[in-house]
Amino acid sequence: GINMGLGEIDGENAYMGGLKIAYVANQQFEVGFASNFLYSEQDIYNNSLSRYEDLIAVYGGLHLEPILFSKNRVNLSFPLLLGAGAVGYVDNKFRHDDDFEEELTEDDFDAVFVAEPGVNALFNISRYLQIEAGVKYRFSSKIDLPPTRITRINGFTAGIGIKVGIFNMGRNRYKKNVQ
């Protein structure tokens, strides 16, 4: 699946995109791997570099999602992502200058652990296509990056996504019709 979302970190807009690969067990529980990319227009001034910076984060990990009402066209699910990643700042000049290239080092990033529970409505469009819409809350470990007023990337994200796969929608592919 692929998803995108809009949220907020420290009062500023945050944009998120994600990918996930999962196995759906008995149409009731999804288990797999998910990864997310987050960008937030923070415009934090860095005195040592004399520039304004924005926040970026990349994290991924174990994806668990119990699914209720799995035999219906509309399902309710409770996704949970448990994982780790990196958070850092980048010069916001790249938004305005196509020729700008920034050299990033390991000092520009800090490790972060993330737990991201949520609630989704899943819409079965066809046997191979599902659309999801929902809300998640991101809990993170503390980060320590200069120049920061942000110590965590906690926050709500509302998003939509699309899942492609084989969704049986209540059909048993192994059951034979006997006449």
Label the predicted regions.
Residues 6-10, 49-53, 104-110, 145-151:
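Outer-membrane beta-barrel domain signature
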Residues 2, 21, 31-33, 64, ...:
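Membrane-embedded beta-strand positions of outer-membrane beta-barrel proteins
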Residues 28-101, 113, 125, 164-166:
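Gram-negative (and chloroplast) outer-membrane scaffold detector with strong preference
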Residues 10-15, 69, 111, 124, ...:
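Outer-membrane beta-barrel transmembrane strands
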Residues 13-17, 54-60, 74, 109-115, ...:
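Residues that define the transmembrane beta-barrel architecture of outer-membrane proteins
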Residues 1-26, 163-179:
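Short glycine/proline- and aromatic-enriched beta-strand/turn motifs that initiate or cap beta-hairpins
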Residues 12-14, 43-48, 88-97, 143-150, ...:
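Outer-membrane beta-barrel translocator domains and adjoining extracellular loop/strand segments
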Residues 122-179:
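Predominantly the C-terminal beta-signal and adjacent terminal strand-loop region
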